[in-house]
């Protein structure tokens, strides 16, 4: 058995299924590049057959990524598999991940198929996929709640058809660590050809045990791949957290005895990027990447850490990418210094034109804010609200008037399909007025279900990072905007959310 643990990141696919976490093609590409910098083994870039937008994102990532394997999810049918292969055709290393449900509940209620029909479809899908790419992963959806005898038949059959990775998901987060570990081990022991494939675990966090279950699948079950997401992002209670699984295996190498290819010094940068892109703020006490992960308030603890760090710290903050909050650039900094700082932070823009545009935004920020932190630069790049390729709305400018005893008034200039429009409105506050000014032209009809503000750094002149969550016709999206002026940040976030609603509507229309 291999002593290398493969890290399979599904932030861009399963993570994006978290309500409001939808990402644009460019946002996915930026995160994929950071995952490659992190040296993730496999990047699940999306579900190519689900929409034209997902196909384009998988295709762009397949073309850009050189070191990591790029994977697309696919249902167990020829159309989905062919679409995935087409999106992956330019990848240096391509994987198709095909799946079909195998639990009695799913087969009867969702698929309306007999076990024999499911078995045949699983075999056919792997056989077809293997003719298109060499690296095939198969997942029995709701595998943990499947009948073991039937599951063994399915997995033995798909390995015989050429599946190179067998992933056994705890789709609804029902498992308990010891039971899940034994479940994986029993499958491997009962299936005659189990040694022909890498065994993988995919655990959800509904009972708060996704990481524990995954570790049990590795230690007890002998799995050598873990599927996970940055910050544990995912639908319902989320997925197994990449940063936690990686640091558990690295910190307790004495127990697990496994090697990792991950460059852990890029973990915090990846966490920040995903948080700022999706608008999902990382809780302060989140293991490894939370703001308090290496903080000590107790006097006894502080005294111990000052004398010897290992009295209360089992890993070093700098090993996962935490650095002191320091000024990195100022208004006199040049373009080359800015470009180098982007590279140090794991940000790779697509073209020199994009670098130039980002540098101009940086200079504008530096004129307004005396101290520029890493967080400011990441927010500046992630929270750009100017209309990108394929985006309908873009922020241009905003002015407001507010005096005590009078209703605030805001005027917003923004673009719609490349043409400038001017909106103006009064409101209950400056933010309300600015968003009503936008709506006076857009008429989206969307309901705002969340509005939150987060200070990016600790000073009074900090940029505010605003998250706006909109809901319309069952679609939920988050928009993020950043600016030292909270009203401007709010307008940017609102336009970002409108762009994502538009993108989701186009995906639904494309699916028919």
Curated annotation (Swiss-Prot):
Its cofactor is Mn(2+). SMART domains: LeuA_dimer (SM00917). Keywords: Amino-acid biosynthesis, Branched-chain amino acid biosynthesis, Cytoplasm, Leucine biosynthesis, Manganese, Metal-binding, Transferase. Residues 5-268 form the Pyruvate carboxyltransferase domain. The keyword Membrane does not apply. It is an enzyme of class 2 (transferase). GO terms for cellular component: cytosol. Its main location: cytoplasm. NCBIfam families: leuA_bact, PRK00915.1-3, PRK00915.1-4. Homodimer. This is 2-isopropylmalate synthase. The lineage of its organism: Bacteria, Pseudomonadati, Pseudomonadota, Betaproteobacteria, Burkholderiales.
């Amino acid at each position: 058995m291999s002593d290398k643990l493969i890290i399979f990141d599904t932030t861009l696919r399963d993570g994006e299924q978290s309500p409001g976490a939808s990402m644009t093609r460019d946002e996915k590409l930026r995160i994929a590049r950071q995952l490659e910098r992190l040296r993730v083994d496999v990047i699940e870039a999306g579900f190519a057959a689900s929409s034209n937008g997902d196909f384009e994102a998988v295709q762009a990532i397949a073309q850009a990524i050189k070191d990591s394997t790029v994977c697309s999810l696919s249902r167990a049918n020829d159309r989905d598999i062919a679409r995935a292969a087409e999106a992956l055709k330019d990848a240096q290393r391509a994987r198709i991940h095909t799946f079909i449900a195998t639990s009695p509940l799913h087969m009867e209620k969702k698929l309306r198929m007999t076990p024999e029909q499911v078995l045949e479809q699983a075999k056919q899908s792997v056989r077809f996929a293997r003719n298109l790419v060499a690296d095939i992963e198969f997942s029995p959806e709701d595998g943990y709640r499947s009948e073991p005898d039937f599951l063994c038949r399915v997995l033995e059959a798909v390995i015989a058809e050429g599946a190179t990775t067998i992933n056994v998901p705890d789709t609804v987060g029902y498992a308990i660590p010891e039971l899940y570990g034994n479940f994986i081990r029993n499958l491997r022991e009962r299936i005659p050809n189990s040694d022909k494939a890498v065994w993988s675990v995919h655990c959800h966090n509904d009972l708060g045990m996704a990481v524990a279950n995954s570790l049990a699948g590795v230690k007890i079950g002998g799995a050598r791949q873990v599927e996970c997401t940055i910050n544990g992002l995912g639908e319902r209670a989320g997925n197994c957290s990449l940063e936690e699984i990686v640091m558990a295996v690295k910190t307790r190498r004495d127990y697990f005895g496994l090697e990792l290819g991950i460059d852990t010094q890029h973990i915090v940068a990846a966490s920040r990027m995903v948080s700022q892109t999706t608008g999902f703020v990382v809780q302060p006490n989140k293991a490894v990447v939370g703001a308090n992960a290496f903080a000590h308030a107790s006097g006894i603890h502080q005294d111990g850490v000052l004398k010897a760090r290992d009295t209360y710290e089992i890993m070093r903050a700098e090993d996962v990418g935490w650095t002191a909050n320091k000024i990195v650039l100022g208004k006199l900094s040049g373009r080359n210094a800015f470009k180098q700082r982007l590279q140090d932070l794991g940000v790779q823009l697509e073209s020199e034109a994009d670098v130039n545009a980002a540098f101009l935004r940086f200079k504008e920020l530096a004129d307004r804010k005396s101290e520029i932190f890493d967080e400011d630069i990441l927010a500046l790049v992630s929270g750009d609200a100017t209309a990108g390729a394929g985006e309908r709305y873009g922020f241009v400018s905003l002015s407001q008037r507010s005096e005590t005893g009078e209703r605030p008034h805001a005027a917003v200039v923004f673009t719609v399909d490349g043409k400038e429009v001017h909106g103006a409105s009064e409101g209950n506050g400056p933010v309300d007025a600015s968003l009503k000014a936008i709506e006076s032209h857009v008429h989206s009809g969307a309901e705002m279900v969340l509005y939150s503000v987060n200070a990016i750094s600790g000073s009074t002149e900090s940029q505010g990072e605003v998250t706006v969550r909109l809901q319309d016709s069952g679609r939920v999206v988050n928009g993020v905007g950043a600016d030292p002026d909270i009203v401007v940040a709010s307008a940017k976030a609102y336009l970002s959310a409108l762009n994502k609603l538009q993108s989701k509507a186009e995906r639904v229309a494309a699916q028919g």
